[in-house]
């Protein structure tokens, strides 16, 4: 019975092989006819995980010809032959109940024979029936592990480009036919090899069949025929190629993309990883656009949306930021003045060709421009180098020492060991010092042979004591300081208010005056019973009264000792010396910083005549600061000279007769009042300045209304410039708002905070003034007028 059963099983296998051959000739249309192979392949589904990767590349190369289906069938049979026969036997039992117990064993050798023959011979199915009897069973088994090994370790690195190139070889029409035939046959006849492909986890070739299998309603109907249609005998000729190509699909995703129509899920997962090749592969399969084209398109659109979202995320954060908020808030330029940046330099003034006075000659731009052009032609550095040379000439490195009779002499030299040369000294050797009669020689140390090491300017040398008159010897420096300072009072006024410091007082505030025990302090003002304001060592400040011994106190009038001084101050204007001035001529009045001068007469716009106690003389007005109003009665010269200049001011401006100190300004911008104290105005309005609250705010009057307004919104009127020029004798001054560095020799350089005595207007943008003995021109927008109290 066993022999009969084996013969019957072999006959059935031969008949099935013939059926396979017939179906391969008819290609795909014959797939639904043979349902017999399905029971064999379905059970091996979970077990054939190892052989699956080999199948994927084959169908990719020959999809249109239909060999892909035969290769899948062959793979399914080979896997069933390795150990999946127990699963295939029950399915065959369902089809042929007589052979159920016997078929599980023999279909497996039959399949292995056919596969063996195919792999070894590579011939068509016609030879398979004969070879099925001759080929032994164990031969095909080692082939499968070889295939799996090849898949695990691909030896051919050049195979992936072959796979990519294989799909385009087929025409679009043939591929479309293959997909259509597969799409039509697969739903009706779901091939069993598909479940095996899922278990194997191979590339999308098998997954394509897997998707087709679930579409079939019943696996028991014609699926067996579909498996028989897949010819395992045609595959042997391409077995080796499939091994090579089986390795290829794993690294490359293009075969997966081609089979996207069968597996929309994988398309969605894999397309975003390789977006560039997709557009070219869309037309290869019609089902791709129908089934998986949509999700792939959604993925493509999804990515740019995400990118836009990520990019827009930064943009979205921009709008909510603070910049848009101030737009709806208070307008900044209306109330707040612009940042204090130095204004632009105005163009040089256009001066008339002829000048009426010699004082304007230095400001002739043509001469300075010619000098600058010469400097630029001679020096590569140009103007910058010329500037440095100019300033170096203006500021000598070491001025000569004050000589006896100079007000600075007693303050700066009496405490220093020094002497005065009695005769002209000509050095006979390099160690001696040459000097002229009257030069002040600073004594450095005692030299050998009874000589003294002295210094004159930057030169040092030896001088014999017989050639000089020693004023402060080396060993009397501590004693001579207080005595000398006491002597220094006599030439000025021995009765001037002063005191002697009893204790050292270190300054703790910016306006404090540091004192050392024994120093003499000039008393300028008595603040209260406990504090004085005084001057010492060319410094002015406040100090406590209990730290000094008052020698001559300040009278209650706080103007000085003598009644005549107080009466004069009540009658006429007073000036406070801003700098020390030493007269070069006998008719000049010398004074120290902080001293109060009675202004008795204006000699001209630059010079005035004044009195300090019992001394009188002329002095430059730019060295003093006017602190008293001009009296209606007082010095005749003052009353005769000032009123005409005030009258000249009146025609320049309509309402300047109200008060000489009043200034007019012109609005550069419109100003809207934000508080009840603000003074609104429009651009071009002329405003009378009543008070300067600080450097940024003024109080003014416009149309019978008073209020405060920002200084940066206005500028002095051109007519005011002329008035100011004529008011210079009254002590009109300007204060520097910014640092200004002159670019030409005729320009006046200054720093912010300097007070300049303005002497003459040049034009609407420039004026001429003096500062610390230097005269020059400067731009008006760098300064502001100071209120005259």
UniProtKB/Swiss-Prot annotation:
| Region annotation Disordered: where it falls in the sequence | 24-170, 209-404, 472-497, 635-663
What is one process in the GO biological process aspect for this record?
regulation of cell morphogenesis
Indicate the segments forming the SH3 domain, all copies. 414-476, 494-553, 570-629, 660-719, 729-788
Q: What superkingdom does the record give?
A: Eukaryota
Tissue expression remark: Expressed in hair follicles.
Answer whether the UniProt record assigns the keyword Transferase to this protein: no
> Which residues lie in Basic and acidic residues bias regions?
296-305, 474-484
Biased composition range(s): Low complexity: 352-361
Where in or outside the cell is it found?
Answer: Cytoplasm
**InterPro entries from the xrefs?**
Endophilin_SH3RF, Eve1_SH3_1, Eve1_SH3_3, SH3-like_dom_sf, SH3_domain
Where are residues bearing Phosphoserine located in the sequence? 65, 368
Matching entries from SUPFAM superfamilies are given as: SH3-domain (SSF50044)
The reply on keyword Cytoplasm is yes
| Assigned GO CC terms | cytoplasm
Q: Which UniProt keywords apply?
A: Cytoplasm, Phosphoprotein, Repeat, SH3 domain
* Composition bias type Pro residues, residue spans: 335-351
Q: Which Pfam families match?
A: SH3_1, SH3_2, SH3_9
What the protein does comes down to: May play a role in regulating A disintegrin and metalloproteases (ADAMs) in the signaling of EGFR-ligand shedding. May be involved in suppression of Ras-induced cellular transformation and Ras-mediated activation of ELK1. Plays a role in the regulation of cell morphology and cytoskeletal organization.
**What is annotated about its quaternary structure and interactions?**
Interacts with ADAM12. Isoform 2 (but not isoform 1) interacts with ADAM9, ADAM10, ADAM15 and ADAM17. Interacts with SH3GL1 SH3 domain. Interacts via SH3 3 and SH3 4 or SH3 4 and SH3 5 domains with SOS2. Probably forms a trimeric complex with SH3GL1 and SOS2. Interacts with SH3YL1.
Protein name (Swiss-Prot/TrEMBL): SH3 domain-containing protein 19
Q: Which organism is it from?
A: Mus musculus
């Amino acid at each position: 019975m066993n022999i009969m059963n084996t013969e019957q099983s072999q006959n059935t296998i031969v008949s099935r092989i013939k059926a396979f051959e017939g179906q391969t000739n008819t290609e795909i249309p014959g797939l639904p006819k043979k349902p017999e192979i399905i029971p064999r392949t379905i059970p091996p589904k979970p077990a054939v995980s190892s052989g699956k990767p080999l199948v994927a590349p084959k169908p990719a190369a020959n999809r249109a010809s239909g060999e892909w289906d035969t290769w899948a069938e062959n793979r399914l049979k080979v896997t069933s032959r390795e150990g999946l026969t127990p699963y295939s036997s029950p399915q065959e039992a369902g089809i042929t109940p007589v052979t159920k117990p016997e078929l599980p064993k023999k279909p497996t050798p039959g399949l292995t024979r056919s596969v063996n023959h195919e792999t070894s011979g590579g011939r068509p199915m016609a030879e398979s029936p004969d070879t099925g009897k001759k080929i032994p069973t164990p031969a095909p088994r080692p082939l499968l592990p070889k295939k799996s090994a090849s898949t695990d370790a691909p030896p051919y690195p050049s195979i992936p480009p072959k796979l990519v190139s294989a799909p385009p070889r087929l025409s679009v029409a043939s591929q479309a036919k293959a997909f259509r035939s597969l799409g039509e046959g697969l739903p009706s006849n779901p091939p069993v090899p598909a479940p095996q492909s899922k278990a194997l986890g191979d590339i999308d070739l098998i997954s394509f069949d897997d998707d087709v299998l679930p579409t079939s309603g019943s696996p028991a109907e014609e699926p067996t025929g579909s498996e028989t249609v897949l010819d395992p005998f045609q595959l042997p000729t391409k077995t080796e190629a499939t091994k090579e190509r089986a390795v290829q699909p794993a690294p490359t995703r293009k075969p997966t993309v081609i089979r996207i129509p069968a597996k929309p899920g994988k398309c969605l997962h894999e397309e975003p990883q390789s977006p560039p090749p997709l557009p070219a592969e869309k037309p290869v399969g019609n089902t791709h656009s129908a089934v998986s084209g949509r999700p792939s398109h959604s993925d493509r659109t999804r990515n740019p949306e995400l990118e836009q979202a990520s990019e827009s995320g930064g943009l979205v954060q921009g709008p909510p930021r603070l910049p848009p908020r101030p737009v709806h808030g208070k307008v900044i330029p209306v109330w707040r003045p612009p940042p204090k940046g130095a204004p632009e330099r105005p163009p040089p003034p256009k001066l008339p060709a002829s000048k009426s006075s010699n004082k304007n000659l230095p400001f002739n731009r043509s001469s300075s421009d010619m000098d600058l052009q010469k400097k630029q032609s001679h020096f590569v550095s140009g103007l910058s180098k010329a500037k440095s040379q100019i300033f170096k000439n203006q500021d000598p490195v070491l001025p000569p020492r004050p000589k006896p009779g100079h007000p600075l002499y007693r303050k700066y030299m009496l405490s220093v060991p020094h002497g005065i040369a009695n005769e002209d000294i000509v050095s006979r050797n390099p160690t001696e010092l040459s000097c002229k009669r009257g030069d002040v020689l600073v004594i450095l140390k005692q030299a050998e042979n009874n000589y003294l090491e002295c210094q004159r300017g930057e030169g040092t040398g030896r001088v014999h004591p017989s050639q000089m008159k020693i004023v402060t010897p080396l060993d009397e420096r501590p004693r001579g300081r207080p005595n000398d300072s006491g002597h220094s009072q006599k030439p000025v006024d021995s009765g001037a208010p002063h005191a002697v410091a009893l204790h050292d007082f270190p300054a703790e505030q910016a306006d404090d005056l540091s004192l050392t025990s024994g120093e003499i302090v000039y008393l300028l003002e008595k603040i209260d019973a406990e504090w004085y304001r005084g001057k010492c060592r060319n410094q002015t400040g406040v100090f406590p009264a209990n730290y000094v011994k008052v020698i001559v106190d300040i009278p209650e009038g706080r103007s000085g000792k003598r009644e005549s001084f107080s009466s004069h101050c009540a009658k006429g204007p007073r000036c406070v010396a801003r700098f020390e001035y030493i007269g070069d001529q006998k008719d000049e009045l010398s004074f120290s910083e902080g001293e109060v001068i009675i202004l008795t007469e204006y000699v001209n716009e630059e010079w005035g005549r004044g009195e300090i106690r019992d001394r009188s003389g002329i002095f430059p007005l730019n060295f003093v600061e006017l602190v008293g109003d001009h009296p209606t009665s007082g010095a005749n010269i003052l009353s005769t000279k000032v009123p005409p200049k005030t009258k000249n001011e009146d025609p320049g401006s309509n309402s300047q007769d109200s008060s000489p100190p009043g200034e007019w300004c012109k609005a550069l911008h419109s100003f809207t009042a934000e508080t009840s104290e603000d003074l609104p105005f429009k651009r071009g309005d002329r405003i009378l300045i009543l008070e300067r609250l600080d450097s940024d705010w003024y109080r003014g009057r416009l149309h019978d209304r008073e209020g405060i307004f920002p200084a940066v919104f206005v500028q002095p009127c051109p007519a005011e410039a002329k008035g100011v020029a004529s008011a210079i004798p009254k002590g009109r001054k300007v204060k520097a708002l910014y640092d200004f560095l002159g670019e030409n020799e005729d320009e006046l350089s200054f720093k912010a905070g300097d007070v300049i005595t303005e002497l003459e207007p040049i034009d609407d943008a420039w004026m001429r003034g003096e500062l610390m003995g230097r005269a020059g021109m400067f731009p008006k927008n760098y300064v502001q007028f100071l209120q005259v109290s």
